[in-house]
Amino acid sequence: MEKFKELLQGEVPLLVDFYASWCGPCKTMHPIVEQVKSMLGDKVRVVKYDVDEYENIASLYHVRMIPTLILFKKGKVIWQHSGVMRAQELFQAVMGAI
């Protein structure tokens, strides 16, 4: 939790991918998130949290569906999406929010 708090307060926006290893749509999103991560470069930090392992963090942000992507800037939620989306849509949403 401390590492997560540090990441949240960083200068670089943080995109969190909440997923589960048993979730089919999460497996679909994995390569998409990785592709967008490389497209974003240093503009955004991307991390993944397994909701079964980090239930406290998922609960704190009311993650009810997976996959859920939440974009933070200086500790505040600035964008959120649940479900699968295409790489270009994700990239444009993140760039539009930051």
Model-derived segments and spans:
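A short beta-strand-turn-helix
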Residues: 1-13
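Non-catalytic, surface beta->alpha helical segment in thiol-disulfide oxidoreductase systems
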Residues: 73-98
